[in-house]
Structure formats: structure tokens, C-alpha cells
Amino acid sequence: MSNYRDIAWQGLWKNNPGLVQLLGLCPLLAVTATLTNAIGLGLATLVVLVGSNVLVSLVREFVPKEIRIPVFVMIIAALVTCVQLLINAYAYGLYLSLGIFLPLIVTNCVIIGRAEAFASRNSVVKAAFDGLMMGLGFTLVLMLLGACREILGQGTLFDGADLLLGDWAKGLTIHLWQVDTNFLLAMLPPGAFIAMGFLIAIKNMIDKQLEARKPALEAAPAVTRARITKVS
């Protein structure tokens, strides 16, 4: 159980693909103009990451080491193609909104990195759990960045939710305040870089505070219980 807890901690926080490894920055910065786009790309990446980890773990004993990277890339490309076709069929608006960044999931270093570093060396269950945690960590960063940029740029949340969930989701859009013109800096890639820098800085501050508390806890004297014997 502690092993799985460590895998979850690595993927969600300590070794987060977006905030620590800084992998997949191209789609992370380009697509997160709205929360809806961030959720769509995050879920697509999550599905591919879990699927590729499972398949790589299944075939790891049969693939020669010399050709393992091309085989891993082919597995990832096949999964991305399936996800792309599904989004094209059931969420065409989101498919158009994500554009070229959807097929570019194939080149996402997070996916090929986990396939090589973890899935090819561990069991199917552990590989699937690692893919799930890394995918969730990446998706959470996408969502947080997308929410910040959408709020600052448009004053809304869940704008275009119907692209992901259908026409019924048009009512999910939240208007936080009325803006005459969008704040372009937040909507464009330079704003994404700035917002990403703030997120990384906040994480580093939290990590430093956690590290500072450890010596104090370790230096605290242990409390021993004294036994009192009543003498009559």
C-alpha cells in the first residue's frame, strides 16, 4: 500500500509532470485559454497515458531493447488515433478547438517518459496506477492554468462547456464579471508563461514550508509515560 501511496504522491505533487518535470509545455501553454479546453486535452492525455502504460507493461517481455522506443511510439500513436477519432465523432467542436495539439499528444514527453522509465519495468497494475496518477497530475495543472487564464481573460468559467458535454452544458457557463474587451495578455501564450511561473513559484513555496517543518518535528523530544505505583 505504501508503494502505491508513493506513486500517487509522485504523480500528483512531488514529481508532477507539469510543475516539476516541465514536460508537455507546448500543449499546456497553448490550449489552456479556457477551462473547457484544458479538461478536454487533460482527459485525452490521461486516457492515452493509462492505455500506453498498460500496453507497454504487457509487451515489455517480448520487445527487444534495441527497438523498444519505436514500438512504444507506435503504441502511443495508435492510442492517440483512437482518442482523436472518438473526440471527432462525439465532440466535434472540442476537436476543432484543440486542433493540432490533439494528435501532438503522440510527442508528449510525459507519455513516452513514463513508458520507458516506469511501465517497461513494472507490472500492469502498477503501470496503470502510475499512468493514472501522472495523468491526473498533468490534468489538474491544465485545469488550474485554464481556470486562471479564463477568469482573468474573459471573466468566465466553463465557457464553451457545450463543446465537451453537449448542448445541455451551455447553462454551465459562469459569468464572474462583465468585461467589455478580453484581457489579451491572459489569453495569449505570454500570459500562459507568466501564469505557469506563478504556479511553479507557489508550489516551491509550499515545498519549502513543508521542509522547514520537518526539522522542528524531528527535534521535538519524545514524551515518555512514567508509571506511578501507589504505596499504601
Curated annotation (Swiss-Prot):
Chief localisation class: membrane
EC main group: translocase
Transmembrane portions of the chain: 18-38, 39-59, 69-89, 93-113, 127-147, 182-202
Topological category with respect to the lipid bilayer: Multi-pass membrane protein
Superkingdom, natural source: Bacteria
Subcellular localization(s) per the UniProt record: Cell inner membrane
Keywords: Cell inner membrane, Cell membrane, Electron transport, Membrane, Translocase, Transmembrane, Transmembrane helix, Transport
Record-listed E.C. numbers: 7.-.-.-
UniProt keyword ATP-binding, yes or no: no
GO BP annotation list: electron transport chain
A Pfam family hit: Rnf-Nqr
InterPro entries: NqrDE/RnfAE, RnfE
GO cellular component: plasma membrane
The keyword Membrane appears for this protein: yes
HAMAP family in the record: RsxE_RnfE
Alphabetical list of NCBIfam families matching this protein: PRK12405.1, rnfE
Subunit structure: The complex is composed of six subunits: RnfA, RnfB, RnfC, RnfD, RnfE and RnfG.
Purpose: Part of a membrane-bound complex that couples electron transfer with translocation of ions across the membrane.
Family statement drawn from the similarity comment of this UniProt entry: Belongs to the NqrDE/RnfAE family.
Protein name (record): Ion-translocating oxidoreductase complex subunit E
Highest classification ranks of the organism: Bacteria, Pseudomonadati, Pseudomonadota, Gammaproteobacteria, Alteromonadales
Gene: rnfE
